């Protein structure tokens, strides 16, 4: 056990009190002046103390186990309290508390200074003297005679002696669980390494008990901090988080006590003789060390020596180093934590402004560099991150026309988040097409009155020349083929001739043989044979003729409808009464289904009443259409770190009596861990066999016990809220304008009705999108910093390793402390590896922070751009990176909707001043109408393919409305109804076709509705013919004939000029010759 070199200087004075059970007062070394700094009146003992069950005192004490005295007061150790109450070392025999170590001269407990802090926790009320370890020492507090400590423990107050709640008599309160021992000194270099490793484990601790631990820019007020530590005899203690301990036994004569059975402790001389001559009896370990006598002498005549039951001396393994410290324990200290200045939230960006450039905007931030920004123009968006004060952000090419509202949302490098709005005037109509013989030229010939005909004729000539060239090439290939085939034909002819000649000779030989035979037999005959002449027909020359037809084919006819949808309310539940000032007050109830429109457009519900020329509109303007996460059950995930610890005890020491105890289960705790970890925390315990014998520091050769525990903790208190997405459904941002003019913005998610506003509730019915890989995604939010991410995760109740959500907690508080009654986990997340005398662990926990940093918002996943959303339906919104169509509609329920309609017909006249924009596009054409109205009213414009409604003010005003067309040249009559007054207006103008937008880096487009037929339609041949020749089949035919005749005439003219030029050149050469 403890090697106490000053044992011989101790003098035990036995004071008999009621027999052998009286306390023993042992005087310390005479030269020691302990306790001089704290007078007895402050509750501290004088130069004597009482020590219980310590091997360096007396063997007599070992024979009186009924003694219950504690160190520190004349009344014995029963007057000493410990905090926390479950401290374990205070109950162990053979271990020194700091009180004992102070009395023995191993350390010094000093009187507390004014700057020393009293840790909160235990109740101090009453006449109490208390001590606690500090970061650089051990201090004590006390009050003088007639005073008692206040409940907060901060000061002493007068004690009447009869106050209720005061602790009786004098008491000592020891804060912490500490065991002290003679240490093995370590060099300064080792101490610095331990200190550095400790600082890496506690990077957010600034000061401990007023002593600087880490340099911090900002720090909190001191607060209680429970931590394990060891005192290695240097300037301050080493605080530890993950460490291991083992208890070693070292055989020494000081580890045995000798006594006579029934008599008492042996005298000093007898004990010395037993340990040197082996003349006594003893247990196995004593006999192994000192030797024993095996006579039959009566037991009371001989001393018997036995090993003191003790855990041994503690060796701490920390940071890869093994240290035998002076003291090892777990206690409460006062620490300050690092405080980072709060990040500036969304606000104004001083010095930020927009500049409009071709195809995008330039964002200038004068105060700080731009970290990231998202800029939306109409339903096109683009994001960028530059790190500069001037950043150009481009949109889809050809996507922006006319006056466009710009919405900017971003963050600066200094942490400032900002939002602001602006507008830009982009080229409109034919002004947006500024190139010759390019794609835009081909798609919009109406913008080039003269160049288009020249281009068409050139194309026809080039086509004709290409056909001629192709025919000549084919002719040349035919001639070349005849040259190649002729030698082959000649070779076959020669072979055929040779075969005929050979066949003829063979025939003649056979005839000659027959003739000889006939002559020999005397028969004469003649044999006549006609020769057959075979004549090969010569192939005739084939003449090649050239045919160059020109064919134009109309493949399909494109159709288009309106973009701003209008539905006329058809409700039979309408009641009206006469109001004041020629007004009729009506109340209506019903339901209507409006086709959903694209961002930036409006759907109108048109209300009229019998007998009233006036009408009103309920308008739904769509600002954005995104995808939102339809959340399933959410849970909380701690920023968990794996921890493990182990303690090795030799056989028959402490809990290791006959090996691993059967009662030590997965939820058991070793005495070494008492107070050092939360028993309600999430963890797993176990016990395994370790090495034994002298080589492992054990008296017993049987395997020792390695008690180990693995657990998880949240050292920084970081919590993530994880919301798995059951589906990604469309969500709209709409602006609802009531017939009365009141406006309210809603964020309806598909299938979820909005709150009732003035009797109206809107339900957005959007179809689901089939996008692969999104069902496993989850919204991940860090609750403190509000950091957002989108990543795969586990569903609630499932803990698949490798995904976020391996540890799931039901509440924010349970995630902060990781309580086992509020969290679930897979114990295999923390692996344990047993070694000779300790255990090490390894972690399989997926780092939520690493995943969140990798997939932080904004991000692009599966062809969708995800960004932060500030509405109540979801924190993240997704937008496809390509033109994605969904089907949708708005269900409008109105109950008790009030309408104020005028009974007087308005005098309203007007004209269309300009038609510009695009056809077969999302935004539609912009129609400028100048109206003169005698009163405020509602105007309704109905054209062949579209209609719209808008509010009209009294007097002369200009209005710009959107109408959709499917042809480039607009020339038609539209009906205008303004406050009951019917008239006609003429629309004339040229529209352009905007190509399907091309994407630039970082750009994307919000979702649009396929039920609105103006969504990026590719023009058909009819659109092109309309733009080229005008509307109508007769114009197309005349235009095509004119182009062909013009091309043919130009061809003949060019041929004539070429021939004329050739003749002139030939004549010039003839004259020169």
Swiss-Prot record:
- Cytoplasmic compartment ranges equal 475-535, 1058-1073
Q: Which InterPro entries match?
A: Phlebo_G2_C (IPR043603), Phlebovirus_G1 (IPR010826), Phlebovirus_G2_fusion (IPR009878)
Q: Where are the transmembrane segments?
A: 454-474, 1037-1057
Annotated signal sequence range: 1-19
Q: Where is this site: Cleavage?
A: 562-563
Residues of this chain annotated as glycosylated in UniProt: 33, 63, 853, 914, 936
Which residues are connected by disulfide bridges in this protein? 26-49, 143-156, 180-327, 206-216, 258-305, 287-292, 349-352, 356-424, 376-381, 563-604, 576-586, 629-725, 644-841, 650-698, 656-705, 660-687, 691-696, 778-793, 809-823, 908-978, 918-921, 943-974
What ranges does the Lumenal topological domain annotation cover?
20-453, 563-1036
Q: Where is this region: Internal signal sequence for glycoprotein C?
A: 536-562
UniProt entry keywords in alphabetical sequence: Disulfide bond, Fusion of virus membrane with host endosomal membrane, Fusion of virus membrane with host membrane, Glycoprotein, Host endoplasmic reticulum, Host Golgi apparatus, Host membrane, Host-virus interaction, Lipoprotein, Membrane, Palmitate, Signal, Transmembrane, Transmembrane helix, Viral attachment to host cell, Viral attachment to host entry receptor, Viral penetration into host cytoplasm, Virion, Virus entry into host cell
- The record places the site described as Important for glycoprotein C and glycoprotein N subcellular location at 1071
Gene Ontology, cellular component aspect: host cell endoplasmic reticulum membrane; host cell Golgi membrane; membrane; virion membrane
Q: Where is this region: Golgi retention signal?
A: 475-521
Q: Where is this region: Fusion loop?
A: 650-656, 691-705
- Which GO biological-process labels does this protein carry? entry receptor-mediated virion attachment to host cell; fusion of virus membrane with host endosome membrane; symbiont entry into host cell
Instruction: Give the similarity note.
Output: Belongs to the phlebovirus envelope glycoprotein family.
What's this protein's name? Envelopment polyprotein
| UniProt organism field | SFTS phlebovirus (isolate SFTSV/Human/China/HB29/2010) (Severe fever with thrombocytopenia virus)
């Amino acid at each position: 056990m403890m090697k106490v070199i000053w044992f011989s200087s101790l003098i035990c004075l036995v004071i008999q009190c009621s027999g052998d059970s009286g306390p023993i007062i042992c005087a310390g070394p005479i030269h020691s002046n302990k306790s001089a700094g704290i007078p007895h009146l402050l509750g501290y003992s004088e130069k004597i103390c009482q020590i219980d069950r310590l091997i360096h005192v007396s063997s007599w004490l070992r024979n009186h186990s009924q003694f219950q005295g504690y160190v520190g007061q004349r009344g014995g150790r029963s007057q000493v309290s410990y905090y926390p109450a479950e401290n374990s070392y205070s109950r162990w025999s053979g271990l020194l508390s700091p009180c004992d170590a102070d009395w023995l001269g191993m350390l010094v407990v000093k009187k507390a200074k004014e700057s020393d802090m009293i840790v909160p926790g235990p109740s101090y009320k009453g006449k109490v003297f208390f001590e606690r370890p500090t970061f650089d020492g051990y201090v004590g507090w006390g009050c003088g005679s007639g005073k008692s400590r206040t409940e907060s423990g901060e000061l002493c107050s007068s004690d009447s002696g009869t106050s209720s709640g005061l602790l009786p008599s004098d008491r000592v309160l020891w804060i912490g669980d500490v065991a002290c021992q003679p240490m093995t000194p370590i060099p300064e270099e080792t101490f610095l390494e331990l200190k550095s490793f400790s600082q890496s484990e506690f990077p957010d601790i600034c000061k401990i008990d007023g002593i600087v631990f880490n340099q911090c820019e900002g720090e909190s007020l001191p607060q209680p901090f429970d931590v394990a530590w060891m005192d290695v005899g240097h300037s301050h203690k080493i605080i530890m988080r993950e460490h291991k301990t083992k208890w070693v036994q070292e055989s020494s004569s000081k580890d045995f006590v000798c006594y006579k059975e029934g008599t008492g402790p042996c005298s000093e001389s007898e004990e010395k003789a037993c340990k040197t001559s082996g003349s006594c009896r003893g247990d196995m370990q004593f006999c192994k060390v000192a030797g024993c006598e095996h006579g039959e002498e009566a037991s009371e005549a001989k001393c018997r020596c036995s090993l003191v039951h003790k855990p041994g001396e503690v060796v701490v393994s920390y940071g890869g180093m093994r240290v035998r410290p002076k003291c090892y324990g777990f206690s409460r200290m006062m620490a300050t934590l690092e405080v980072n200045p709060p990040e500036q939230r969304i606000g104004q960006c001083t010095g930020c402004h927009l500049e409009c450039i071709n195809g995008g905007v330039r964002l200038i931030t004068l105060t700080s560099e731009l970290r990231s920004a998202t800029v939306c123009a109409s339903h096109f968006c683009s994001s960028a991150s530059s790190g500069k004060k001037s950043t150009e952000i481009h949109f889809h090419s050809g996507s922006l026309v006319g006056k466009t509202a710009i919405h900017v949302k971003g963050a600066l490098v200094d942490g400032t988040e900002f939002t602001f709005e602006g507008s830009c005037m982009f080229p409109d109509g034919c002004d947006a097409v500024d190139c010759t013989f390019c794609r835009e030229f081909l798609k919009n010939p109406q913008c080039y009155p003269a160049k288009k005909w020249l281009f068409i004729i050139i194309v026809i000539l080039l086509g004709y020349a290409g056909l001629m060239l192709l025919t000549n090439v084919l002719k040349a290939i035919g001639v070349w083929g005849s040259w190649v085939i002729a030698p082959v034909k000649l070779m076959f002819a020669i072979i055929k001739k040779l075969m005929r000649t050979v066949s003829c000779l063979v025939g003649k030989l056979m005839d000659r043989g027959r003739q000889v035979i006939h002559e020999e037999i005397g028969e004469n005959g003649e044999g006549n044979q006609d020769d057959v002449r075979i004549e090969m027909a010569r192939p005739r020359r084939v003449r090649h003729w050239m045919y160059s037809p020109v064919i134009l084919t109309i493949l399909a006819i494109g159709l288009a409808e309106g973009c701003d949808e209008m539905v006329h309310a058809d409700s039979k539940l309408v009641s009206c009464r006469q109001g004041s000032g020629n007004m009729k007050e009506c109340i209506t109830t019903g339901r209507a289904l409006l086709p959903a429109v694209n961002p930036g457009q409006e759907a109108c519900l048109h209300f009229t009443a019998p007998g009233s020329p006036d009408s009103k509109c309920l308008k739904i303007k769509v600002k954005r259409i995104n995808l939102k996460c339809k959340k399933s059950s959410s849970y909380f995930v701690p920023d968990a770190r794996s921890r493990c610890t182990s303690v090795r005890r030799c056989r028959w020491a402490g809990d290791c009596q006959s090996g691993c105890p059967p009662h030590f289960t997965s939820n058991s705790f070793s005495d070494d861990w008492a107070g050092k970890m939360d028993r309600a925390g999430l963890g797993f315990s176990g016990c395994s066999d370790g090495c034994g014998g002298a080589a492992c520091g054990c008296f017993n050769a049987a395997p020792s016990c390695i008690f180990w525990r693995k657990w998880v903790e949240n050292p920084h208190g970081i919590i993530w809220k994880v919301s798995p997405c059951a589906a990604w459904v469309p969500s709209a941002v709409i602006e609802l304008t009531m017939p009365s003019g009141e406006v309210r913005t809603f964020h309806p998610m598909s299938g979820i009705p909005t709150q009732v506003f003035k009797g109206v509730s809107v339900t957005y019915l959007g179809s689901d999108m089939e996008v692969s890989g999104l069902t496993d995604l989850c919204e991940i939010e860090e609750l403190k910093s509000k950091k957002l991410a989108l990543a795969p995760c586990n569903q609630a109740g499932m803990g698949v390793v490798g995904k976020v959500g391996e540890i799931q907690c039901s509440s924010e508080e349970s995630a902060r402390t990781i309580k086992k009654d509020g969290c679930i986990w897979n114990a295999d997340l923390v692996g344990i590896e047993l070694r000779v005398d300790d255990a090490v662990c390894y972690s399989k926990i997926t780092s939520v922070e690493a995943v969140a940093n990798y997939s932080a918002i904004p991000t692009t996943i599966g062809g969708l751009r995800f960004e932060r959303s500030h509405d109540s339906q979801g924190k993240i919104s997704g937008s496809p990176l390509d033109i994605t169509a969904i089907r949708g509609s708005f269900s409008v329920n109105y109950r008790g909707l009030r309408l104020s309609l005028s009974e007087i017909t308005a005098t309203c006249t007007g004209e269309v001043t300009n038609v510009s924009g695009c056809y077969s596009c999302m935004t539609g054409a912009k129609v400028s109408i100048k109206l003169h109205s005698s009163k405020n009213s509602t105007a309704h414009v109905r054209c062949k393919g579209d209609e719209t409604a808008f509010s009209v003010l009294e007097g002369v005003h200009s209005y710009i409305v959107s109408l959709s067309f499917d042809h480039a040249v607009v020339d038609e009559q539209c009906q205008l109804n303004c406050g009951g007054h019917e008239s006609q207006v003429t629309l004339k103008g040229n529209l352009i076709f905007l190509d399907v937008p091309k994407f630039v880096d970082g750009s994307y487009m919000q979702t649009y509705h396929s039920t609105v037929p103006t969504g990026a339609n590719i023009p058909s041949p009819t659109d092109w013919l309309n733009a080229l020749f005008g509307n109508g089949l007769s114009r197309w035919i005349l235009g095509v004939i004119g182009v062909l005749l013009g091309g043919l005439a130009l061809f003949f003219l060019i041929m004539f000029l070429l021939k004329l030029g050739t003749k002139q050149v030939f004549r010039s050469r003839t004259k020169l010759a």
